[in-house]
Amino acid sequence: MKIGVASTLTVYAITAGVFFLIDLFWLGVLAKGFYAKHLGHLLREQVNWPAAVAFYLVYIAGIQVFVVGPALQGGWGVGHTALWGGLLGFFAYCTFDLTALALIKSWPLPVVFVDIAWGTVITAATAAAVIILSRTLIKALGAV
């Protein structure tokens, strides 16, 4: 499926919305106590929103460039898309967590495992959901 610039921007917006909502639920509800327990001494009282927004914009662009775009262009199935999304999440979150473990004193090992698993799951789930939503929207509107 060939998509134009408007469709690419629409799919980016869908990716951003899906990823942000899932991550907000994870960080704000499900894992809030876990991170407070293990990283409480390092956590800010207020989120550094410019840094957070920069992360989301860059990471979502990565999902778009390396997974969702090729999936739409190549006609990948949902499972194939989720697999590649999971791999991207695994490698990206490994990069952060293993670097933190190597360089930051007392970086908690449980955080490494949970965070890498989370990166794998959220990126796989986001990629799969975005493919379903994007294809549905593109078909319904003919092109976005």
Where are these regions (language model features)?
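Juxtamembrane/disordered regions of integral membrane proteins
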Residues: 2-118, 122-144
